[in-house]
Amino acid sequence: MLEGFEPGLSGFVHVDFNNIDQVKNQIDENTAGILIETVQGEGGINPAEKSYLIELNQIAKDNDLLLFFDEVQCGVGRTGKFLAVEWVKNLNPNIVSIAKGIGGGFPIGALLLDSK
């Protein structure tokens, strides 16, 4: 799914969507965080499995990693809740990106951050 979106930034590792084992195998002492598009919008509407998001949350907590949810396409009420991740209880992302739902057609985005 990277074709057409290259070159990528150095230092980022991509894993298959909803594959928690691949995530676990990529974490090392240089890992700063986990970035995921919670509902992938290219090639259809593909939400992350709830169990996957719960495990990502725990991995981030256990390894003191930042958890970053990209909700540019699905945030701000587009799934029936303010954020798509609100459909899963007790998720605590450190960063959430939002955009399309706040702009009303105007190109604007925002980051929601916690104190970490």
Language-model features: locations:
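Conserved N-terminal phosphate-binding loop of PLP-dependent enzymes in the Aspartate aminotransferase
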Residues: 1-116
